[in-house]
């Protein structure tokens, strides 16, 4: 089976991309164990706890990221440069444990995947 990477690059709640990406990720995990999750650019905001999506009449799907471990999704990466650009600390308690990688290392890791789905 092909290796599949899910890349979250959009902020949560502005569009349905994050929610749809998470749904696709969980569904795909039933078919293969060979997948990983990458958080880049504004996608790093998907990792923040304590969001208030009800204020913009959006569904709170962020807590569902906590289920990744139950679905045996253990390869989670976050772009260290994206965190810095947005004033976030890699030591922040994110909703899912994601390993920070610098941009070059993240690109090398992403190159190991056959299919890349971006949300």
From Swiss-Prot:
Gene Ontology annotations of biological process type: tRNA wobble position uridine thiolation
Please name the Gene3D superfamilies in this protein's record: DsrEFH-like (3.40.1260.10)
Alphabetized InterPro entries for the sequence: DsrEFH-like, Sulphur_relay_DsrE/F-like, Sulphur_relay_TusC, Sulphur_relay_TusC/DsrF
User: In the UniProt record, does the keyword tRNA processing occur?
Assistant: yes
Question: Where is it mostly found?
Answer: cytoplasm
Q: Which GO terms describe its cellular component?
A: sulfurtransferase complex
Keyword Cytoplasm included in the entry's annotation: yes
Q: Where in the cell is it found?
A: Cytoplasm
The UniProt transmembrane annotation reads none
Which keywords does this chain's UniProt record carry?
Answer: Cytoplasm, tRNA processing
* Alphabetized SUPFAM superfamilies for the sequence: DsrEFH-like
Complex formation: Heterohexamer, formed by a dimer of trimers. The hexameric TusBCD complex contains 2 copies each of TusB, TusC and TusD. The TusBCD complex interacts with TusE.
**Stated role:** Part of a sulfur-relay system required for 2-thiolation of 5-methylaminomethyl-2-thiouridine (mnm(5)s(2)U) at tRNA wobble positions.
NCBIfam families assigned to the protein according to its UniProt record, in alphabetical order:
PRK00211.1 (NF001238), sulf_tusC_dsrF (TIGR03010)
Similarity comment: Belongs to the DsrF/TusC family.
Query: PANTHER family per the record?
Result: PROTEIN TUSC
Protein name as it appears in the record: Protein TusC
Instruction: Say which species the protein is native to.
Output: Escherichia coli (strain K12)
Q: Which gene encodes it?
A: tusC
């Amino acid at each position: 089976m092909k290796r599949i990477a899910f890349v979250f690059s959009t902020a949560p709640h502005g569009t349905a991309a994050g929610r749809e990406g998470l749904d696709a990720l969980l569904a795909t995990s039933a078919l293969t164990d060979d997948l990983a999750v990458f958080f880049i650019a504004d996608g790093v905001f998907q990792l923040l706890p304590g969001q208030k999506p009800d204020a913009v009449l959006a569904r709170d799907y962020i807590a569902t990221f906590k289920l990744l471990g139950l679905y045996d999704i253990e390869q989670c990466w976050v772009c260290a440069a994206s965190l810095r650009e947005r004033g976030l600390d890699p030591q922040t308690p994110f909703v899912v444990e994601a390993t920070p990688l610098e941009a070059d290392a993240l690109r090398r890791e992403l190159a190991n995947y056959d299919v890349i789905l971006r949300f």
